[in-house]
A protein has these predicted regions:
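A solvent-exposed, charged loop/short amphipathic helix patch at secondary-structure junctions
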Residues: 25-44, 124-135, 260-264, 269-275
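His/Asp/Glu-enriched short active-site or ligand-binding loop at hydrolase and phosphoryl-transfer sites
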Residues: 176-218, 288, 295
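Acidic-and-aromatic substrate-binding clefts and catalytic sites of carbohydrate-active enzymes
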Residues: 43-52, 74-94, 117-121, 163-172, ...
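Conserved, mostly hydrophobic/aromatic
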Residues: 20, 112, 162, 177, ...
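Active-site beta->alpha N-cap acidic-glycine motif
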Residues: 1-105, 157, 163
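Metal-dependent polysaccharide deacetylase catalytic core of the NodB/CE4 family, i.e.
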Residues: 62-170, 203, 212-214, 246-253, ...
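Catalytic grooves of carbohydrate-active enzymes
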Residues: 211-297
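C-terminal beta-sandwich/jelly-roll accessory domains of carbohydrate-active enzymes
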Residues: 302, 306-370
Length: 370
C-alpha cells in the first residue's frame, strides 16, 4: 500500500497565521520613544517595537508558529506624512536587516500591494480608492512586477503570493496576477469556511484561505455573550480541524487607524486571544505552515497520482508546476526507487510508515533492511 497524506506528516489540519500591513512606518513622528501600539514595523525588533511585543508575548512561547507577513512594498499612500514616519521597504538599511532577520526565522513575506490605496480622512470604505483604480491595468502590473523584481534582487527571495488590502480585487485583473508569477492569492475572508481551491474562478492561481480572526477569543463587556462566543468558536475550530480544513488566522501588525479608531483585528489588542488559541492548539495533531508551504502541498496533493503495479511496486507521477512536496503513507518501512536504486526509510506515526522525501519514480516496498 502506498497513498498520499492529506496534509504534511499525516496531520489533521494545517494552521496558518497571516499578518497584514508590516511596513517601515510609525504613527507618531514627534515621539522619541517607540511604543508598540503606534508601530507598524519601523521599530524593527528593537525595544518598544510591535515585533518585540509579538515575539515576547507569543512567539517565544510558541516557537512552532509559522507566519506569513503581508507587506505593502511602497510607501503607504494613506499615511499622514506630516505626523508619521513612512518609508518604502527598500529605503532604510535597518529595515532591510530586519526583513532578512524575518526570512532567516523561516517566516514568509508576501505581497500586500504597492501603496495600499488612497483614502479620505474618515477612512470611509465607500471612498477607498484601491491601487488598481489609480492606474491602467498595464501600469498597475508593471508596478507589481517592478516591486517583485526589486525584492528578489535585494533579498534573493521570490515572493510566491499575496493579498489585496481589504481583500478588494477585480476578477478581470486575475490574469495579471498570473502573469506576475504569483502561485497563490488570498482573495477573501470567509469565517470558518475552508476556502482553499486549486484554481480561482478558472484561473491557474491557488485560492488560499483566510477564515479565522485573531480576536476570536477576546472577551467583551457582557460575560454571558462572551462565554457563548467562546464555546461556539471552540466548536467551530474543532469542526474545521477534525474535517481536515486549512485553518488560516487573520491579523494586522498595525493597531492605530488615522481616524483615531482602532484597527481590528490587531496583534497588540489580540495578544491574549492569540495566546489562548495557540495554547489550545498545542496538543493537536496539526501542521504549522506558511501560506506558500500550504499552497505547495495542496497543489502537490492534487497533482500527484499513484499507480499500484502489483507485487509491492508503485509508480508516483507528478503533473504539477511546483516541486512535489508531499507526505506518503505506506505499510512498508523501506521504499526502493527501482530506477535510481536509492532506498528511503520511513518514520512511524499511528502504526504506519510515512515518507516526506520521495520523488517521481517507480518504487518497491520492503519491510526489512537488505
Amino acid at each position: 500500500m502506498l497513498k498520499k497524506a492529506k496534509w504534511k506528516d499525516d496531520c489533521l489540519s494545517p494552521i496558518l497565521l497571516g499578518i497584514d500591513d508590516l511596513c517601515d512606518g510609525y504613527f507618531k513622528k514627534d515621539y522619541e520613544k517607540i511604543f508598540p501600539f503606534f508601530d507598524a514595523g519601523y521599530g524593527t525588533s528593537n525595544d518598544g517595537s510591535i515585533f518585540r511585543y509579538l515575539n515576547k508575548n507569543l512567539l517565544q512561547k510558541y516557537p512552532e508558529i509559522k507566519i506569513t507577513f503581508f507587506l505593502p512594498f511602497g510607501k503607504g499612500a494613506y499615511w499622514d506624512k506630516e505626523k508619521s514616519i513612512i518609508n518604502d521597504i527598500f529605503e532604510r538599511d535597518e529595515f532591510e536587516k530586519f526583513l532578512n532577520f524575518v526570512l532567516d526565522c523561516d517566516y514568509e513575506i508576501a505581497y500586500h500591494g504597492h501603496d495600499h490605496g488612497l483614502v479620505n480622512s474618515t477612512i470611509d470604505p465607500n471612498t477607498w480608492c484601491c491601487e488598481f483604480d489609480q492606474y491602467s491595468k498595464e501600469e498597475y502590473f508593471e508596478i507589481i512586477k517592478s516591486d517583485l523584481a526589486k525584492f528578489k534582487d535585494k533579498f534573493g527571495y521570490e515572493v510566491c503570493g499575496g493579498r489585496s488590502p481589504g481583500y478588494k480585487f477585480k476578477d478581470d485583473l486575475i490574469d495579471g496576477l498570473c502573469e506576475c508569477g504569483f502561485k497563490w492569492w488570498s482573495f477573501d475572508y470567509k469565517p470558518f469556511i475552508n476556502n482553499i481551491n486549486l484554481k480561482y474562478n478558472g484561473y491557474n492561481i491557488i485560492e488560499m484561505p483566510s477564515n479565522l480572526s485573531g480576536d476570536m477569543f477576546n472577551y467583551g463587556k457582557n460575560p454571558i455573550k462572551s462565554a457563548a462566543k467562546y464555546f461556539l468558536n471552540l466548536y467551530r475550530l474543532e469542526h474545521m480541524i477534525k474535517g481536515g480544513q486549512a485553518v488560516s488566522i487573520a491579523e494586522h501588525f498595525f493597531r492605530t487607524r488615522f481616524d483615531g479608531k482602532i484597527q481590528m483585528p490587531n496583534i497588540y489588542n489580540d495578544i491574549n486571544s492569540l495566546d489562548f488559541l495557540f495554547g489550545y492548539l498545542r496538543n493537536k495533531d496539526i501542521w504549522y505552515a506558511t501560506f506558500s508551504e500550504c499552497a505547495n502541498y495542496y497543489e502537490s496533493y492534487n497533482n500527484t497520482d499513484i499507480s499500484d503495479m502489483g507485487d509491492g511496486v508503485f509508480e508516483i507521477k507528478y503533473k504539477g508546476s511546483w516541486k512535489m512536496f508531499l507526505t506518503f503513507i505506506s505499510e512498508y518501512r523501506y521504499l526502493e526507487n527501482i530506477q535510481t536504486k536509492e532506498i528511503y526509510e520511513g518514520f512511524m506515526k499511528n502504526n504506519r510508515w510515512l515518507f516526506n522525501d520521495l520523488v517521481e519514480g517507480i518504487y518497491r516496498g520492503h519491510q526489512n533492511v537488505f
